[in-house]
Amino acid sequence: GSRRIRATAWYNGERQTVSVGIRIKAGKSPRTMNYRVVNTFPHDKEAYTQGLFYHNGYLIESTGQKGMSTLRRVEIKTGKVVQSVNLDQNYFGEGATLYKDEIYQLTWTSRKGFVYNPQTFSLIRTFEYLTQGWGITTMQDTLIMSDGSNVLYFLEPKSFTELRRVEVCDNNGPVSQLNELEYIQGKVYANIYQTDRIVIINPASGMVEAQVDFSNLLKLSDRHRNIDVFNGIAWDEENQRLFVTGKNWPKLFQVEIF
């Protein structure tokens, strides 16, 4: 990440200060991991997937595009949308997560988010933030948000105030375009926007410890005219299942990383 070093000295009774900015890289390159497909399921090919997480046997999915943004409950095996709420047409839906039996959903440039009842999808309250909203996930009693840069913001859930932030980097420098997030077994998994990569981040240091390339996941025969980028990570902790998909992808994949 970025750091600034400042030196102050006194000369002939005058104080002089010099500062210089430096950029810190990770000490070693990320481990390259592989994946295998465990299961393939249908996915709504008109769902512009922005956020995804597992809850009580279903996937909760946040979709984007103005006039098409939703929060929905999806049956995994069939891809059927069993419950849905539409956002106002002025909002572009983004990431979503569950914290203490409440669903948090971001919007892209409106700097406004929504909190829902996870059973009824009724709106409980709204919240505001100072950046764009991209991805969001839950780490114990903290929310972690991305804004498309290389920064992860750690937020207090009730007030949405910033507790701290880390800059994400690897051995080559900053890793930006952090998009959808999922907290899995002590690490933050992040989609890198406009790529088929997921990076695995140490949330304390911001260092990218590993990465997975999913370039060949979606077959050419499944790529229709409105297909968009790889995005969406969901983790079923109880059954140790990892799900990934993409925007307007016709399929959802259960994968294993090794």
State each model region's role.
Residues 36-42, 80-87, 121-127, 164-173, ...:
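A short beta-strand motif characteristic of beta-propeller blades
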Residues 38-72, 84-97, 134-135, 246-252:
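Beta-strand-rich domains and repeat architectures in extracellular enzymes and scaffolds
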